[in-house]
């Protein structure tokens, strides 16, 4: 991807493997519905190993890092074909991460316990969802840089990239209680597709 200058020294560029430590940090610092979740975890990298690393490693074409100066302050992650991506992860990624966390010899926090459950149930998205919304995306920006318009520019950029690549629709997962995010995505035309007490899946067709 071409670098996108978003103003005030903020840059969106392609993410790479060397960015992973910083991307994992951002994932942790936004892991509590956009707020810092560091205090909730004894396994600081696990949240990012579930929600960020798979994209950078196995779908780098649509993985971007947001930088303020030299510091990574956000990321934008996309997948063109969710089903194909999940096939790859099931074979090449999840077994490695599961093995890493198989034997933990100390008490975990409730948040870490939930992540371990999430890790162990990784599988496939509902076919009715991916049939209509085959692509998906994930974005996070640290709290100090939220509300500056960067997220809007980032999402618009990725939606254009997915459309150009031939996608017919995209979905995303978010906390059902995150009303701010819900309003944000609705401005792009996303609608609620599936929802329960904890999670909302929103979708957009092209």
Go through the PLM ranges and name each one:
Residues 11-25:
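A short beta-loop-alpha structural element at the N-terminal edge
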Residues 32-51, 89-98, 102-107:
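Conserved GNAT-fold acetyl-CoA-binding loop/helix
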Residues 41-63, 69:
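Active-site rim helix/loop that mediates acceptor-substrate recognition in acyltransferases
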Residues 65, 71-80:
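Conserved beta-strand in the GNAT
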Residues 83, 171-173, 186-204:
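Conserved catalytic-core motifs of GNAT/GCN5-like acyltransferases
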Residues 83-138:
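Conserved acyl-donor/pantetheine-binding loop and adjacent beta-alpha core of acyl/acetyltransferases
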Residues 133-135, 162-175:
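Conserved GNAT acetyl-CoA-binding A-motif
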Residues 138, 147-164, 183-187:
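Conserved acetyl-CoA-binding loop-helix of GNAT-fold acetyltransferases
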């Amino acid at each position: 991807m071409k670098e996108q200058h978003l103003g005030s020294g903020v840059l969106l560029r392609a993410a790479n493997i060397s960015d992973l430590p910083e991307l994992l940090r951002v994932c942790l610092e936004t892991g509590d519905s956009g707020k810092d979740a560091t205090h909730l975890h004894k396994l600081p990298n696990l949240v990012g190993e579930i929600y960020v690393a798979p994209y950078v490693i196995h779908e780098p074409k649509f993985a971007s890092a947001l930088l303020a100066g030299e510091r990574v302050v956000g990321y934008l992650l996309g997948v063109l074909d969710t089903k194909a991506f999940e096939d790859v992860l099931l074979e090449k990624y999840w077994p490695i991460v599961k093995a890493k966390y198989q034997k933990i010899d100390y008490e975990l926090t409730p948040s870490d316990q939930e992540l371990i459950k999430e890790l162990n149930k990784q599988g496939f998205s509902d076919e009715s969802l991916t049939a209509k919304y085959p692509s998906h995306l994930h974005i996070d920006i640290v709290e100090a840089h939220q509300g500056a318009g960067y997220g809007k520019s980032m999402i618009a950029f990725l939606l254009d990239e997915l459309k150009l690549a031939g996608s017919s629709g995209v979905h995303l997962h978010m906390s059902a209680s995150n009303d701010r995010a819900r309003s944000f995505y609705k401005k792009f035309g996303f609608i609620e597709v599936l929802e329960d007490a904890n999670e909302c899946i929103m979708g957009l067709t092209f």
